[in-house]
Amino acid sequence: MKVKLICVGKLKERYLKDGISEYQKRLSRFCQFEMIELTDERTPDKASFADNQLIMSKEAQRIHKKIGERDFVIALAIEGKQFPSETFSELISGVTVKGYSTITFIIGGSLGLDSIIKKRANMLMSFGLLTLPHQLMRLVLTEQIYRAFMITKGSPYHK
C-alpha cells in the first residue's frame, strides 16, 4: 500500500520536519509513505475574492497533476467528516479491501482547496472546527495515519 500526502507550501520549521520524519520512519513498516510539497501561490494583501479563486485554481492544477487516476483521495476540509481514530483506522483498512493501492491525502494552502479538488476527492475529512496552521496539520495527520495502522495491528500505542 502507498500513502501519499500532497501539501501546498513548503515546510520550514525544523521541529515539524523532525516530527514528520519520525512518523515517516515508523510508517515504513506498514506502507510506502510519500510527502509531496507543492509551491504555493503568493496571496497579495487585500486580495479580492476573484484573486483568491485564481490562486486556489492554480494550486489545484498542481495538486491534480500529483493525484493518480486510481488513487483513493481524502481531502482535508473544514466541512468534511470527523472520525474517532478507530473509525479512521477502519476507513484506511477498508480502502485497501475495495481494491485501491494508493491513498492520497491532500492539505491545501492558506486559502483552502479549490472545488475541483473537493469534487475529485472520494471523501472530505475534517479534524474539527479549530483552525490549525497547515504545516502543523501535516504532523497531526501523519501521526493519525501511523495511529490508524497501529490500531489495526492491535498495538498498545493507541490507548
UniProtKB/Swiss-Prot annotation:
UniProt-annotated location(s): Cytoplasm
Enzymatic reactions: pseudouridine(1915) in 23S rRNA + S-adenosyl-L-methionine = N(3)-methylpseudouridine(1915) in 23S rRNA + S-adenosyl-L-homocysteine + H(+)
Keywords: Cytoplasm, Methyltransferase, rRNA processing, S-adenosyl-L-methionine, Transferase
Chief place of localization: cytoplasm
Matches recorded under Gene3D superfamilies: 3.40.1280.10
Positions with a binding annotation for S-adenosyl-L-methionine: L76, G108, F127, G128, L129, L130, T131, L132
Disulfide pattern: none
Pfam families according to UniProt: SPOUT_MTase
EC numbers: 2.1.1.177
Record-linked CDD domains: RlmH-like
GO CC annotation, single: cytoplasm
Source domain of life: Bacteria
Enzyme class, first EC level, given as a word: transferase
Any one GO MF annotation of this record: rRNA (pseudouridine-N3-)-methyltransferase activity
Quaternary organization: Homodimer.
Homology family: Belongs to the RNA methyltransferase RlmH family.
HAMAP family tied to this protein: 23SrRNA_methyltr_H (MF_00658)
Function: Specifically methylates the pseudouridine at position 1915 (m3Psi1915) in 23S rRNA.
Protein name per its UniProtKB record: Ribosomal RNA large subunit methyltransferase H
